[in-house]
Swiss-Prot record:
The keyword Membrane applies. It comes from Arabidopsis thaliana. This is Probable inositol transporter 2. Optimum pH is 5.5-7.0. It is a multi-pass membrane protein. The chain crosses the membrane at residues 36-56, 71-91, 106-126, 129-149, 156-176, 189-209, 275-295, 315-335, 343-363, 452-472, 490-510, 521-541. Belongs to the major facilitator superfamily. Sugar transporter (TC 2.A.1.1) family. It is found in: Cell membrane.
Length: 580
């Protein structure tokens, strides 16, 4: 349980108040921004691998048409993040929030160096694991540190800056990817530059204090009070200190120890259990609605939609990353105005519609793929696709059939008179690719020419615009404020670990799913999961807008998990506002 100050009506002007308070007290903004670089690291790693993977496939032929190995390179960072998030929960409670961030920075920097120097895919995977460890720790620590070092009335807006820096990191990674497309060592630069923000945060965090609430919980009361006096105004700080003192003393009295966390009691505690249902559920659904298929594989999805070149795929993916960053800015404005719950519901409605569009577009693209021209294919008989030459009925072959050939892998060379006309199915290697390009034709290995490509980009854009302000940022905000102080580190670690496990499942299965059942059916699955997520939010997630953290705990204590579990204002808030 944690103390806080009641601020009636803060939700109506939170965005302006955030600017006003941070302008008057830039120290608060400095705390939020420095810790938020952890979000930048998170976002950069999510985005950079999507572009780097295009060039890793070109450099390592063992990776090029090996779907499992591509998924491994992407998902090993996620596997590392699972362990990192679990370790982060322990490190946050035992060593402190700041120490956990410093550990994350060191691991991320080490991983970036290993990846940049990797001579083979195996060492690249090792580097991805180290980066994942750092990202996992940072993902749950940064919003927690910001939340505990923020005045209650602008807590949502400041924690949203972490979400903005996540999406900003993704946008930056696409810019970096695009900048290094023509530079020797392309993907090595893309992955190695990731160490710079980690080093920057490491330096900045050495100049900042530990979380005041963690310090108070560990008995370092004078240090905590000194920090709170720098964060809160003179008229609010004494009340905040008293509330925090009362909450910590109550916890110690109830639990009998300020150090040892009893996991059985944690699971039995009504407030913790209900908080975990909401917090873990949001983190799981954040991944299962498919966001990181878009962020990890965005250029690949663009190529599946019919855009052939790596550079074009990266350039168009930059648009989705920009929309993602824009959506997080929207979240900062609305999070303390309309609330967490409404933002989630609006977000999921839009996600469902967008996934419906993507399902339809990719279905139409697959069923209208250009046919294979026997004349074009056999023009160079020595490079004709072997599976095509041995097929009983070549009239049934189209571009999609060609790309599924595997003995050996084959590619599609578009018609010289137009990409929608029948083209050639040839063996996929660099010399054949060059031959196709020398005839001013397009070479496809991951998707087919399509007149529906721009509609796919529209669907991706709408998906990002709706996802980012709600499901993109709100789960991290809710998890930073919904747990009692005593269990906040461990519960945050549990929720973040659930997020990364879900992330791993999605990242390791997306390309395999698209190969097995097609891109359209894969997006349909995400759409169905999004409907389930919407129902979950409506029933299980409380509204915590503008509420001090001790009041959130009391709300969880007295309400049952039913459809009307939340209200605009709790009774305690109304009573305290009336008596103020």
């Amino acid at each position: 349980m944690e103390g806080g100050i009641i601020h009636g009506g803060a939700d109506e002007s939170a965005f302006k108040e955030c600017f006003s308070l941070t302008w008057k007290n830039p120290y608060v903004l400095r705390l939020a921004f420095s810790a938020g670089i952890g979000g930048l690291l998170f976002g950069y790693d999510t985005g950079v691998i999507s572009g780097a993977l295009l060039y890793i496939r070109d450099d390592f032929k063992s990776v090029d048409r090996n779907t499992w190995l591509q998924e491994m390179i992407v998902s090993m960072a996620v596997a590392g993040a699972i362990v990192g998030a679990a370790i982060g929960g322990w490190a946050n409670d035992k060593l402190g929030r700041r120490s956990a961030i410093l550990m994350a920075d060191f691991l991320f920097l080490l991983g970036a160096i290993i990846m940049a120097a990797a001579p083979n895919p195996s060492l690249l995977v090792v580097g991805r694991v180290f980066v994942g460890l750092g990202v996992g720790m940072a993902s749950m620590t940064a919003p927690l540190y910001i939340s505990e070092a923020s005045p209650a009335k602008i807590r949502g807006a400041l924690v949203s800056t972490n979400g903005f820096l996540i999406t900003g990191g993704q946008f930056l990674s696409y810019l970096i990817n695009l900048a290094f497309t023509d530079v020797t060592g392309t993907w090595r630069w893309m992955l190695g530059i990731a160490g710079i923000p980690a080093l920057l945060q490491f330096v900045l965090m050495f100049t900042l204090p530990e979380s005041p609430r963690w310090l108070y919980r560990k008995g370092r009361e004078e240090e905590a009070k000194a920090i709170l006096r720098r964060i809160y105004s003179a008229e609010d700080v004494e009340q905040e200190i008293r509330a925090l003192k009362d909450s910590v003393e109550t916890e110690i009295l109830e639990e009998g120890s300020s150090e040892k966390i009893n996991m059985i009691k944690l699971c039995k505690a009504k407030t913790v259990r209900r908080g975990l249902i909401a917090g873990v559920g949001l983190q799981v659904f954040q991944q299962f609605v498919g966001i990181n298929t878009v962020m990890y594989y965005s250029p690949t999805i663009v190529q599946l939609a019919g855009f052939a070149s790596n550079r074009t795929a990266l350039l168009l993916s930059l648009v989705t990353a920009g929309l993602n960053a824009f959506g997080s800015i929207i979240s900062i404005y609305f999070i303390d105005r309309i609330g967490r719950k409404k933002l989630l519901i609006i977000s999921l409605f839009g996600v469902i519609i967008s996934l419906g569009i993507l399902t339809g577009v990719f279905y139409e693209a697959a069923t209208h793929a250009p046919a294979i021209s026997s004349l074009e294919t056999q023009r160079f008989n020595n490079i004709s696709c072997p599976d095509y030459k041995s097929a009983m009925n070549t009239n049934a072959w189209d571009c999609m059939t060609c790309l599924k050939a595997s003995s050996p892998s084959c590619g599609y060379c578009s018609s010289p008179i137009g990409k929608e006309h029948p083209g050639a199915c040839w063996i996929s290697d660099d010399s054949v690719k060059d031959l196709c390009h020398n005839e001013n034709r397009l070479w496809y290995t991951r998707g087919c020419p399509s007149n529906f490509g721009w509609f796919a980009l529209l669907g991706l854009g709408l998906y990002i615009i709706f996802f980012s302000p709600g499901m993109g940022t709100v789960p991290w905000i809710v998890n930073s404020e919904i747990y009692p102080l005593r269990f906040r580190g461990i519960c945050g670690g549990i929720a973040a670990t659930a997020n990364w496990i879900s992330n791993l499942i999605v990242a390791q299965s997306f390309l395999s799913l698209t190969e097995a059942i097609g891109t359209s059916w894969t997006f349909l699955i995400f759409g169905v999961i999004s409907v389930i997520a919407l129902l979950f939010v409506m029933v299980c997630v409380p509204e915590t807008k503008g509420m001090p953290m001790e009041e959130i705990e009391k709300m969880l204590e007295r309400r049952s998990m039913e459809f009307k579990f939340w209200k605009k204002k709790s009774k305690l808030v109304e009573k305290q506002n009336q008596s103020a």
